């Protein structure tokens, strides 16, 4: 059996990706039995995909908050502790779901199809309490690997529109990716999800953010200058048009662009960037030193992007059959 742990911050598109991956494999690789496992007890009541194994049958974050009178973080820790005691239930349900999916593939193929190894997609919770405050996720990973002989890969999603918003947010995304990589100790793939939400200009500029390991040498200072230029321009417009109701005169745009170009040349990053620039630069030097971070763009509606990501995952886990 092979599988992927779909993780990332809340709102990064994990659940949407899981459903998109299931639909993609059902069309382009119908001989691969796919089992979906939801491990997030805080997922919404109306689930966007048919879930083979759902941890909410064991514990629900909302019910824990109501019955135990705990806050959100305390409820997550309570859920994690209960999930750890029900590892056997999860393994049993996964085994039953695998048997069902294998039968479905054989029946659909008329009995003449040789199924590929089962494939497990795990929708992981995004809250940090499940990783730093509890051993439940690591216990489950080891149980899947040992008891089901499941070869796993971490697919770490971050929102492209958020991560490429500014340099400091991008640095945070890189640190989060490295932390997850070290914590899971599994083959690892980083993904910029929601790539389709970027504008054409942002999408072209976003190509630079995909290459984290070469970001320092090629794009760091250039993008910092661009960020500072945009900040200065916004401040200037705020002074000229304080109410926001006035429109920038089109005749002013060429002179504004020329002034922006002059400002780029005049920007002293050490002085104008301040402590944030120096701190971000120091952190990115650490990221660059690892030489392990890069991102794949993903639009779940794009066949090419889904195919490329699926091939990368299969290469990581050795799923070549």
Segments from the language model and where they lie:
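Nucleotide-state-sensitive switch-loop elements of NTP-binding domains
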Residues: 1-7, 12-139, 145-151
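Alpha-helical scaffold elements adjacent to nucleotide-binding pockets in ATP/GTP-utilizing enzyme cores
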Residues: 17-21, 136-140, 173-180, 308-312
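Canonical P-loop GTPase G-domain recognition
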Residues: 184, 196-321
């Amino acid at each position: 059996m092979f599988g992927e742990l779909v993780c990332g911050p809340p709102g990064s598109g994990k659940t949407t990706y899981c459903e998109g991956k299931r639909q993609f494999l059902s069309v382009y690789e119908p001989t691969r039995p796919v089992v979906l496992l939801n491990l997030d007890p805080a997922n919404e009541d109306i689930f966007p995909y048919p879930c083979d194994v759902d941890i909410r049958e064991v514990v629900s974050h909302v019910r824990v908050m109501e019955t135990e009178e705990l806050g959100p973080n305390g409820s997550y820790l309570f859920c994690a502790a209960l999930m750890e005691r029900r590892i056997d239930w999860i393994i049993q349900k996964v085994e039953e779901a695998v048997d069902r999916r294998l039968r479905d593939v054989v029946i659909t193929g008329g009995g003449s199809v040789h199924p590929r190894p089962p494939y497990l997609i795990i929708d992981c919770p995004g809250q940090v309490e499940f990783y730093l405050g509890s051993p439940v996720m690591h216990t489950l990973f080891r149980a899947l690997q040992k008891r089901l002989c499941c070869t796993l890969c971490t697919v770490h999603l971050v929102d492209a529109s958020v991560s490429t918003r500014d340099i400091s947010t991008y640095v945070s995304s890189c640190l989060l990716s490295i932390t997850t990589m070290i914590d899971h100790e599994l083959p690892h793939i980083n993904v910029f999800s929601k790539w389709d939400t970027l504008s054409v200009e942002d999408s072209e500029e976003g190509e630079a953010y995909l290459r984290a390991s070469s970001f320092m040498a090629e794009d760091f200072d250039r993008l910092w200058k661009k960020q500072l230029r945009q900040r200065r321009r916004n401040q200037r417009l705020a002074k000229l048009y304080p109410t926001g109701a006035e429109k920038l005169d089109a005749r002013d745009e060429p002179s504004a662009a020329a002034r922006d170009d002059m400002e780029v040349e005049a920007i002293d990053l050490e002085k104008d960037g301040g402590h944030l620039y120096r701190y971000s630069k120091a952190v990115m030097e650490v990221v660059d030193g690892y030489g392990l971070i890069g991102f794949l763009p993903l639009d779940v509606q794009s066949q090419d992007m889904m195919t490329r990501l699926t091939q990368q995952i299969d290469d990581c886990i050795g799923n070549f059959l």
